[in-house]
Design a protein with these regions (language model features):
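Active-site catalytic loop in hydrolytic enzyme cores
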Residues: 150-240, 252-253
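Boundary at the C-terminal end of the N-terminal hydrophobic targeting segment
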Residues: 28-30
Length: 376
């Protein structure tokens, strides 16, 4: 609860956000997130069958270059060349999916150094990719480390961008949550989970699991792995194609999630140098149907572009011929779900800029303090 005496001392922007958070906490579900009759919103399909292409490639870390600008230019050129290749080989793509970090790669060091190895979305890089999307008449999807100096100063964001056929950013998908309990470190990036209240106040509940309704089907993009509840929520919201970006992943997870939720799915993984300890986990990108059957796959750790034509008209027809989402036994499981207490509370990165953890080790300390399960 916001105390009246504290209002006068708040900066205008902070006051507005605080009031929005207070309002969102009292107005439960002001918008309809799931229709009661099992239907979901969609736009008419431009065509019955849609072509998805998935790119897997080796990305160089920006810190490996003499300067960040040189690194971005190199990685952007690589993305451009792969996009042109995807547009000129095989069938014309309607969607081109890249991996989690094709522009930035990874970064080490303190937060201030990691922030240098990020991009803004939209920004110069999405503008350049937008020209390619427009020329190819395709959607381009990719993940990236990103920053937002206006709304989220000091935070390292993990975003998935969708660039439309018109060359503009159509949607930005935040990472829902991070995997926990790595050992000596925790991932210090900002997700919906760890700034939940401010996120909802700023963007609304619809953006917790946003759905981009396109002329080729309802899509969403996610970087989370082995997280069935997240994907069930997306399915309830009407997702028909689940695009996934990763650095290392579980093939069975992709197949099972698609089968459980009756949607198409595509996963793009990066590749690693052959002498890397992670080389065995590189590549393996795939596209699966709503039963989890593999439609296209490259099991190697090599650069590749795979493609599959998917029947969106048949998917819609097959969903009980009434635009129905999958069936979930919510009433049966709710008594258990209602009593489950997550180990880590929401909003654990809703702290002042100077208190944001500087490294994975510092994030580990913060998370251990926040844990509801560990002995204090």
């Amino acid at each position: 609860m916001i105390k009246p005496k504290s209002l006068a001392s708040m900066p205008l922007q902070t006051l507005a956000l605080a009031l929005a958070i207070a309002a969102s906490s009292t107005a439960a579900h002001a918008v309809t997130l799931v229709e009661k009759d099992g239907s979901y919103a969609q736009v008419p399909l431009e065509k019955d069958k849609v072509v998805i292409k998935v790119v897997q490639n080796l990305t160089r870390n920006l810190q490996d270059f003499p300067s960040i600008d040189e690194g971005l230019a190199h990685n952007l050129e690589q993305m451009a060349n792969l996009t042109k290749r995807a547009c000129s080989e095989g069938k014309k793509p309607d969607f081109i999916l890249f991996n989690e970090f094709p522009l930035t790669g990874y970064s080490d060091g303190p937060r201030v150094e990691k922030l240098k190895s990020t991009i803004t979305i939209p920004g110069p890089e999405t503008d350049a990719l937008g020209k390619l999307a427009k020329a190819c008449d395709t959607y381009i999807i990719f993940g990236s480390y990103a920053r937002d100096d206006v709304d989220w100063p000091g935070h390292i964001l993990s975003l998935n961008a969708v660039i439309g056929r018109d060359g503009k950013v159509a949607e930005k998908f935040w990472k829902t949550r991070n995997i926990k309990n790595y050992g000596d470190i925790e991932i210090p990036t900002t997700t919906i989970e760890n700034v939940y209240d401010k996120y909802v106040a700023r963007y609304g509940e619809e953006e917790l699991f946003p759905v981009l309704r396109t002329e080729f089907g309802n899509i969403a993009v996610s970087t989370v792995q082995n997280d069935p509840m997240v994907f069930a929520a997306y399915a309830m919201r009407g997702v028909e194609i689940m695009f996934r970006t990763a650095t290392l992943f579980n093939k069975l997870d992709v197949q099972a999630i698609a089968g459980f939720n009756n949607f198409y799915s595509a996963m793009s993984n990066i590749t690693f140098p052959t002498d890397s300890p992670y080389a065995k986990g590189g590549g393996g990108s795939l596209i699966v149907d709503p039963r989890g059957q593999v439609l296209a796959e490259d099991p190697s750790n090599d650069e590749a572009i795979i493609e599959a034509e998917i029947d969106m008209a048949a998917l819609r027809k097959g969903r009980n011929k009434a635009r129905h989402i999958p069936h979930y036994p919510m009433a049966v499981v709710r008594p258990v779900f209602d009593q489950y207490v997550e180990e880590f509370p929401l909003n654990h990165l809703d702290v002042a800029i100077d208190q944001l953890p500087d490294s994975g080790a510092e994030m580990k300390v913060l998370m251990d303090k926040q844990s509801r399960w560990k002995s204090k």
